[in-house]
Swiss-Prot record:
Record family assignment: Belongs to the tfa family.
A Gene Ontology BP annotation from the UniProt entry: virus tail fiber assembly
Listed name of the protein: Tail fiber assembly protein U
Subcellular compartments: Virion; Host cytoplasm
Lineage of source species: Viruses, Duplodnaviria, Heunggongvirae, Uroviricota, Caudoviricetes
Function: Chaperone involved in tail fiber assembly. Expressed alternatively with tail fiber assembly protein U'. Remains associated to the tail fiber and participates in the host receptor binding. Two alternate tail fiber assembly proteins U and U' are encoded extending the host range of the virus.
Pfam families, alphabetized: Caudo_TAP (PF02413)
Induction: Expressed alternatively with tail fiber assembly protein U'. The switch from S-U to S'-U' is performed through inversion of a DNA segment called C by the phage invertase protein Cin.
GO cellular component: host cell cytoplasm; virion component
Chain's gene name: U
Annotated coiled-coil segments of the chain: none
Provenance organism: Escherichia phage P1
Keyword rRNA-binding part of the UniProt annotation: no
Alphabetical keyword list: Chaperone, Host cytoplasm, Host-virus interaction, Late protein, Viral attachment to host cell, Viral receptor tropism switching, Viral release from host cell, Viral tail assembly, Viral tail fiber assembly, Virion, Virus entry into host cell
Amino acid sequence: MQHLKNIRSGNPKTKEQYQLTKNFDVIWLWSEDGKNWYEEVKNFQPDTIKIVYDENNIIVAITKDASTLNPEGFSVVEVPDITANRRADDSGKWMFKDGAVVKRIYTADEQQQQAESQKAALLSEAESVIQPLERAVRLNMATDEERTRLEAWERYSVLVSRVDTANPEWPQKPE
């Protein structure tokens, strides 16, 4: 099975390659061990999955046809076409680590960033519920149920705004 690591663009190494670059602006891609991507792509097996992953081992592309890939700046590995490997996708939630396709392991910083995004989304949702209820109260058009809902959502909004995203504990959303 093929595994080409850290593929980068580089200079042509033969006269033929130089002529192709000169005549057609061909960009040559080389793995860290000096293998030519355009030659190696022919050696991938047709019945395997080809996975492209970044410097953090995060899967960024998956295909059965290696010739469709532009792996510049990435690594490409060939893995068996089995259920365990087919479950992966290029959503950023999967990794190629220690020779296997695994669910992504997030760093503490990434987890905090995800919590920040979730916090912003929850606050936005709360505001979208609160605004029309506030308007109904301000215009003396609110029912008792709307006043109760407004208070519940405002309390929820305050609790969400106080969540420590380094160690999030999310409050229960009002009904």
